Curated annotation (Swiss-Prot):
Protein task: Catalyzes the isomerization between 2-isopropylmalate and 3-isopropylmalate, via the formation of 2-isopropylmaleate.
Pathway where it operates: Amino-acid biosynthesis; L-leucine biosynthesis; L-leucine from 3-methyl-2-oxobutanoate: step 2/4
Protein name: 3-isopropylmalate dehydratase large subunit
PANTHER family the UniProt entry points to: 3-ISOPROPYLMALATE DEHYDRATASE, HOMOACONITASE, MITOCHONDRIAL-RELATED
Organism: Teredinibacter turnerae (strain ATCC 39867 / T7901)
Length: 474
């Protein structure tokens, strides 16, 4: 029998039946729900007279619309100023209460961003199929799981049947060997990958991340990388199970205990690609050559090393690409030949499902300790990804490091990653952001997003412009 990839194993374990059109019916182990893509799904169940098939497979929490300031959060749902946002959060509460679904509500200390809460509670585990009405559900693949985003109609299907019709994707291996240099993080690695293969490079593939760099990477780092597999065009990203995975999962609230843990661990240790597995495509990078990255344009593939200069569309031989570069430069207010380190920032956002875990908060705090936010920076905010992250950071005194630097410490939520709540950019403002998308208007109408690591964002908050974190740390 031919060797199988990690994705092959996860897929095969969950196929219920194969259909004549080449698609399969697959079983879903875990369903994560938030307030934005679930209301129509719950209403569809209600209209059809159906109930969720397995309420114990569902975990819900509001994240996109929740305010992140202490004053707003003190009033719970009533503190949400926007009426549409308030309705969405209240509707999630009502649906979960009615159907008996576990929900971490707005003032529950377990509330947070779905892609942070799932792994940290043990709600998402190795070997699972995991879905959520959110494209960044790929995050959970870092645990050795098959995890991907679905649409609202599919949310209803999974609630009703615990199954989903899907077509198997092709296999891609992205292998990064060598050792990362000082100041180079998981965020820089995934941005470098996207710069290399483009935002369509992973289309139709499930990506496995392998090689020396990922074997040495923390679970928080792996979660960051798999989170942005979708920005590389793939629906799912994943990393093989190893000791780092098992150490992370063990003891978490929903993780197996006692004899069940021993059985689960034995099974999970098989979740890796076989030595003779064949991938449809293999991409290789040298980790030692990756530098701290900064996005300059309006697509996650428009990324440069921090010591780079803004490209000139006149030097682009492909007319379509040249037009895209020109359009991006116009929107971003940048000029060809401008140094990345000469770009001034108006706001700084450290948070999102990409970079709001405790490792990210620690990295940012290390940079700003004993310093003060630049006067030219209008606002810098740090938004932990969950109540658990917030509590851990506060226990370590990290919140006080930020506030002493005139950087705001907030409540958990998606925040400035997307303009669906009160945290957003003004027109023309440049933001050093640890989020995952830099599309036009993503963080607010006319806002200009630069994707960076937490350390790079923190350094920009202090300096007022981008700096090479390697020099900062030397």
């Amino acid at each position: 029998m031919a060797g199988r990839t990690l994705y092959d194993k996860l897929w095969d374990d969950h196929v219920v039946s194969q259909r004549d059109d080449g698609s399969s019916l697959i079983y879903i182990d875990r369903h994560i729900v938030h307030e934005v893509t679930s209301p129509q799904a719950f209403e569809g169940l209600r209209i059809a007279g159906r109930k969720p098939w397995r309420t114990d497979s569902v975990i819900a929490t509001p994240d996109h619309n929740v305010p992140t300031t202490f004053n707003e959060r003190a009033s719970g749902v009533d503190g949400i100023a926007d009426p549409i946002s308030k309705i969405q959060v209240k509707t999630l509460d009502d649906n979960c209460d009615e159907l008996g679904i576990v929900e971490f509500k707005i003032n529950d200390n377990r509330q947070g961003i779905v892609h942070v809460v799932g792994p940290e509670t043990g709600g998402c585990l190795p070997g699972m199929t995991i879905v959520c009405g959110d494209s960044h559900t790929s995050t959970n693949g870092a645990l050795g799981a098959l995890s991907f985003g679905i649409g609202t109609s599919e949310v209803e299907h999974v609630l009703a049947t615990q199954c989903l019709v899907a077509k198997k994707m092709k296999n891609m291996l992205i292998k990064v060997d060598g050792q990362l240099g000082q100041g180079v993080t998981a965020k820089d690695v995934v941005l470098a990958i996207i710069a290399k293969i483009g935002t369509a490079g992973g289309t139709g593939f499930a990506i496995e991340f392998g090689g020396d760099v990922f074997r040495a990477m923390s679970m928080e780092g792996r979660l960051t990388v798999c989170n942005m597999a979708i920005e590389a065009g793939a629906r799912a990203g994943m990393v093989a199970v190893d000791e780092i995975t098992l150490d992370y999962v063990k003891g978490r609230a929903f993780a197996p205990k006692g004899d069940h843990w021993a059985m689960a661990e034995a099974r999970w240790r098989e979740l890796h690609s076989d030595a003779d597995a064949v991938f449809d495509e293999v991409v290789e990078l040298d980790g030692a050559q990756i530098k701290p990255q900064v996005s300059w344009g309006t697509s996650p593939e428009m990324v440069l090393p921090v010591d780079g200069v803004i490209p000139d569309p006149a030097q682009e031989s492909d007319g379509v690409k040249a037009a895209g570069v020109a359009r991006a430069l116009e929107y971003m207010g940048l000029t060809p030949g401008q140094k990345i380190t000469d770009i001034a920032v108006d706001r700084v956002f450290i948070g999102s499902c990409t970079n709001s875990r405790i490792e990210d908060i620690r990295a940012a705090a290390k940079v700003v300790a004993g310093k003060t936010k630049a006067a030219s920076v209008k606002e810098a905010i740090v938004v932990p990804g969950s109540g658990a992250v917030k509590a851990e950071a506060e226990a370590e005194g990290l919140d006080k490091i930020f506030t002493a630097a005139n950087i705001e410490w907030r409540e958990p939520g998606c925040s400035m990653c997307l303009a669906m709540n009160a945290d957003r950019l003004g027109e023309g403002e440049h933001c050093a952001s640890t989020s995952n998308r830099n599309f036009e208007g993503r963080q607010g109408y006319g806002g200009r997003t630069h994707l960076v690591s937490p350390a790079m964002a923190a350094a920009a908050a202090i300096s007022g412009h981008f700096v090479d974190i390697r020099d900062w740390q030397s």
